[in-house]
């Protein structure tokens, strides 16, 4: 019986970029690896260990090249990595040393952020060779095999291409994506940052969720409302939700989303749901005959039904001292509009 190949467990690198690893090039703890770049050039990467107190200052992430939305790297979203990186780092990050001497992290921004939070060192495969922006972007796409980029992170990258003048059709062709996915990604990227930042684990957000946030942003924008008031109003409740450690991440997301939509509805509909206040001006024996005043907010109107022209043509309202001198009559019911007031 032939043995079946066991499936690979863990992180695998794209074989097209890995030209080989020579074990003889590893002396002691020093590891050397050669990657093939998109231009056909080869670059040698040597492992370095960045001390805990230098990780933040000696490394950086260019989101344009890395592709990971750095604002989404919250302590809660990094929980799984933080719990392991304190003891060991299974895979090194990959970076290039720039002219400033700092290391740009092409792959491993989540490991970098976790190392900073936990105050531990960071292992990085670093090359001192000059790598172009295009080579860096392609290499980052090839080696990133950890957590798949969210539709918003993809959209943020595509948004830069669109802002550079590319059409959505050209973007789709260049990235090997359908035009529908490009549209969805761009819409997710347009969701208000202020609202997205309220979610501790943004990778839980779906396209439908981003559409909801976009709708909230549009509605508040139409009413010239700022997000600050909304955020201030719901922050205590969000803190209460986040204080429940055992709550599942998707449940946390759903609760926060409901808070946002509910508060946005209250803010945008404020004043539009004022109930009409109706005051009876005269009591008639005929139940279908009436004379009344209706007030809704700052607007008011007078309504009459089954009254003669003589009565409605010139009606004096003693309650406010206003003489109504003009009326428009429709069928047997009448609503005074427009008004001519004399005080």
UniProtKB/Swiss-Prot annotation:
Gene Ontology biological process terms, A to Z: plasmid partitioning
GO molecular function, one term: DNA binding
Originating organism: Escherichia coli
Function: Control of plasmid partitioning; required to recognize the cis-acting partition sites.
Location of the DNA-binding region in this protein: 169-188
InterPro entries found in the cross-reference section: ParB/RepB/Spo0J (IPR004437), ParB/Sulfiredoxin_dom (IPR003115), ParB_fam_C (IPR014884)
Keywords for the protein's UniProt record, in alphabetical order: DNA-binding, Plasmid, Plasmid partition
TM region(s), chain numbering: none
Family per similarity comment: Belongs to the ParB family.
SUPFAM superfamilies: KorB DNA-binding domain-like (SSF109709)
PANTHER family, sorted: PLASMID PARTITION PROTEIN B (PTHR38973:SF1), PLASMID PARTITIONING CONTROL PROTEIN-RELATED (PTHR38973)
Superkingdom field: Bacteria
Protein name: Plasmid Partition par B protein
Source organism phylogeny: Bacteria, Pseudomonadati, Pseudomonadota, Gammaproteobacteria, Enterobacterales
Pfam family, one: ParBc
Comp. bias intervals (Polar residues): 11-26
Annotated stretches, region: Disordered: 1-26, 56-76
